[in-house]
Amino acid sequence: MSSKLTVYQATTSMADSPRDPFQSRSQLPRFLATSVKKPNLKKPSVNSANETKNPKLASLEFQLENLKNDLKRKELEFEREQIELQRKLAEEHEQKNSLQLRLTLVEKQLEEQSTSYQKEIEEVRNEKEATQVKIHELLDAKWKEIAELKTQIEKNDQALSEKNHEVMVSNQALQMKDTNLTNLEKLFADSREQLETKCKELAAAEQQLQELSVHNQQLEESIKQVSSSIELEKINAEQRLQISELEKLKAAQEERIEKLSSNNRNVEILKEEKNDLESKLYRFEEYRDKVATLELENEKIQTELNSWKSLITNELPTPEAVSNKLVFLQNTNANLGERVSSLESQLSNKPANQPLGANEKDAAHITELETKLKELHEQNRRLQRQKSLATQEIDLLRENLKSYDDEEAILSEKNTDMKKLERIEGLVKLVDEYKLKLESMPVSLDVDETSDEVSLQKRRRKNEHKDAGYVTELYRKNQHLLFQVKEKTNIEAFLREQIITLESSIATLRQELAQVTEINSCRVLQHRSNPTLKYERIKAAQLEMLNAENSALKALLEDKKVDCLPIQSFKIAERKALDLKKEVAEREKRIQRLKEIFSVKSLEFREAVFSLFGYKLDFMPNGSVRVTSTYSREDNTAFIFDGESSTMKLVGNPSGPEFERLIRFWCDERKTIPGMLAALTLELLDKND
């Protein structure tokens, strides 16, 4: 069965009359569905007796006919598949031939490119070797220069202290030289004007000389003709005198020109010396700033040392006092331990009249209370340690602030911000207040604890026989103390948080002050990424290359024998080629990105069309669009719309022969391709149902 490939012009009119569009949907042409022939269900004409006798034979004949029909249908399908495979083979063969041709062309191009690249690589290798040799030589020279510079730097560092005095003297000399320079510049300008006038006079004198020489030649010629030699000798003598005077004038002018040129050189030397002295002055100022900062740091360290020394001398003036204090603390600790042991023994030696259960309960309760007391004491010790550390940190920060303020007052006397300083002082006062509150808190705690202990001891002495009441009283007091400790710890935590916030605000204010002082003291000369500098460098490099090329071309013009171009022109062309390659690479990247974006967007568009209209769109490389229906059971059948030739092709094997009527009615008469596609979808839906 031959495959159909029908082409329809969208604007042509068909000769046949259109069918009625209001007919029933079942009478519309069938598309993309295989018409399966129904098997012949007619039973063979046999006698009724034979039918009754052989029903099995009739059923077998019926099955045989069905099998024959199936076999024919399968043969037809096989033929159709064979034709399609042959067509695909032919297409693949054509594609293979075209690909082979392309491959040969590409191989030739690659061979040419490889040869050119190999030549370029060899040239580059040679250039690289030469450049590496040059680089090694330059590196050796630079290392030697660096060593020499290091020695010079060491010498300069040693001579810096001596040159500080010289700088002061040189400043005065500089001022004198500046005045001399201005005078010399004025003299130079005057002498230049005089020189120009003298040059003009010289040119006029040279013209006169030339005229006189011409006149002399004329006279010499006339001497030959005229016999009176005495008059000619007089004229010659006068001319010789004039020539000698002019030569003397010329020599004097040349001497004056030499003097002025030497003066000009001296002026340039003085300018260079002035620049050197200015750079030395700048370095001297930097060293002076460093000395000031070092002095401030030294003063700070000395104040810290003095404070530590005063503490040691005031509280503990001698090492004997330190040892005595240690012994005293050890004795107090031992006394307290003895007191605790005596109290424990008193508790253990209670009267025997008390029941055992109560004693055990009281002992357990007392142990619990003792553990709680120990925990509280440990917490108190920790808090005291934290407090001491915090006070030390605050003192250090204050000293740093004072040193910073002193530095600021010394360095920038005018640019001090009074508001910020007042704010810092207020914050410091707040910190002092919180510190006083923290110091007052443990004192009140100690007072409460001591008063409670005294009252407890009195009650113990008075009411030793009433241990149960004593324990309850102790428990109540302990609870009260715990509550007080919790309150005090909460207050202390709150105050510590406030201290931390104040310290952070002080740190931020310091940073702001430092930034302000840096901004006031620093001067931005040039940024790192300066586009104007980059442009100027590129421009300078291009100008150098062009000047080199120009000089080489001039040399070529002078030497007419040379046939080849200079290297500079080749370098410029190479640079242009590199720029073009960069542009091409950027454009290729851009095109690739646009292609990727277009593929993503086209996929979205195709999916939208597929979900809305039920047609799959495939964009071909030649610009045409392949349209296949989702409801068709045959994948090969599809429409191909070509925009350039404005044609619509049907590719594949449409099963319905009435498809031409559908195209006549919708495309030729109604001239709507969307209507035809909609009718097709309805027809395929009916068939599938």
From Swiss-Prot:
Pfam families: MAD. The keyword Metal-binding does not apply. Residues 1-54 are annotated as: Disordered. InterPro entries: Mad1 (IPR008672). One of its GO terms (biological process) is cell division. Its main location: nucleus. One of its GO terms (molecular function) is kinetochore adaptor activity. It is found in: Nucleus. Residues 50-423, 486-601 form a coiled coil. GO terms for cellular component: kinetochore; mitotic spindle; mitotic spindle pole body; nuclear envelope; nucleus. PANTHER family: MITOTIC SPINDLE ASSEMBLY CHECKPOINT PROTEIN MAD1, MITOTIC SPINDLE ASSEMBLY CHECKPOINT PROTEIN MAD1 MITOTIC ARREST DEFICIENT-LIKE PROTEIN 1. This is Spindle assembly checkpoint component mad1. The lineage of its organism: Eukaryota, Fungi, Dikarya, Ascomycota, Taphrinomycotina.
